[in-house]
């Protein structure tokens, strides 16, 4: 039986590796093409190539569910077309045992993806964005809003060295505007923020008063480590960062839905991958030997895209209709498991 596990695993590992190389290669060529404009604007090919290479861990992590799905269809499909699965069944090996062998083989990729997505991809993606910022000459983040009590703060951008640019603070009391402060930059020095080149405007006896200052200590709870979170898409963050920033947003009275959605999607990705593999197994055993490799790949791509599309729709819908993001990402997984179980039962 141990030899059976190894034999099935070799077929699946080889198929998944080939599928990953094909998908990743196509995606990297597309990404390189989208960055060619930067070469015309003075960037070197080395800088662009460095950026592309640094995004590889993130791309591998994102493609892993689809890659494993298609790889299992190809690997198991090859065994089915050679009647090897039929021979295994005739030798007394149960369908459940074959499914278990496949799941063990896939677990290697699931574990690798989890480690990659939590410890490698967030770091390399941040480095990639810094590299892109340097050769494009743009700020490392787009504008973002913060809230501190009655203060509403807008930061237009953050440089790669963590310096805030164009900080605007609007202070309200009882829904009435009290004061506006605009600073050219904000720097974290020691253990506090310092605003520089600032102007403060307020209303006094129906007269607008304006005062300028060179610098001012800014008492705000925003920590420098949160800036790296703000500069990245929630989908690219580590689970620890998602939890930390979600808590900060809740404490500030701001919407944390995008980060909560990304948290649950990341937590459930291993289960999502395994559920797609279950669908792949059921499709192979539930179909005839005449199914071609192209048909299996097409089915795998369609199922993977449909699964991802449903998750992307249900995720934001959970915020609109008020149900938990956990349910939004869990429902497609349960549907895949139920559908796979039904097809396997029909296959005997």
Which role does the model predict for each range below?
Residues 136-203:
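USP/UBP deubiquitinase core
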Residues 206-208:
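Beta-sandwich strand segments
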């Amino acid at each position: 039986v141990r030899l059976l596990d190894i034999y099935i695993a070799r077929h699946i590992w080889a198929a998944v590796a080939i599928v990953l190389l094909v998908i990743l290669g196509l995606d990297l060529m597309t990404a390189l093409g989208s960055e060619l404009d930067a070469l015309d604007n003075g960037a070197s090919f080395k800088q662009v190539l460095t950026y592309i290479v640094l995004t590889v861990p993130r791309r591998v992590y994102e493609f892993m569910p689809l890659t494993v799905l298609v790889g299992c269809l190809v690997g198991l499909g090859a065994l089915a077309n050679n009647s090897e699965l039929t021979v295994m069944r005739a030798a007394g090996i149960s369908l459940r045992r074959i499914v278990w062998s496949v799941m063990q083989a896939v677990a290697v990729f699931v574990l690798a993806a989890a480690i990659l997505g939590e410890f490698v991809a967030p770091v390399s993606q941040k480095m990639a964005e810094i590299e892109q910022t340097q050769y494009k000459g743009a700020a490392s983040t787009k504008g973002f809003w913060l809230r501190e009590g009655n203060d509403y703060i807008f930061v237009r951008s953050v440089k790669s060295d963590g310096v805030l640019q164009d900080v605007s603070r609007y202070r309200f009391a009882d829904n009435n505007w009290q004061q506006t402060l605009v600073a050219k930059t904000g720097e974290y020095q020691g253990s506090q923020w310092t605003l520089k080149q600032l102007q403060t405007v307020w209303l006094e006896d129906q007269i607008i008063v304006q005062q300028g200052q060179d610098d001012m200590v800014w008492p705000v709870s925003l920590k420098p480590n949160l800036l790296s979170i703000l500069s990245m898409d929630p989908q690219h963050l580590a689970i620890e960062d998602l939890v930390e920033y979600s808590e900060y947003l809740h404490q500030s009275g701001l919407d944390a839905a995008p980060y909560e959605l990304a948290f649950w999607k990341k937590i459930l990705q291993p289960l999502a991958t395994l559920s797609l593999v279950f669908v792949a197994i059921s499709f192979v055993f539930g179909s005839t030997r005449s199914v071609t490799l192209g048909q299996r790949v097409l089915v795998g791509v369609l199922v993977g895209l449909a699964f991802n599309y449903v998750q992307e729709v249900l995720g934001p819908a959970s915020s609109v209709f008020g149900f938990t993001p956990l349910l939004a990402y869990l429902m497609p997984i349960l549907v895949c498991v139920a559908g796979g179980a039904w097809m396997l039962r029909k296959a005997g």
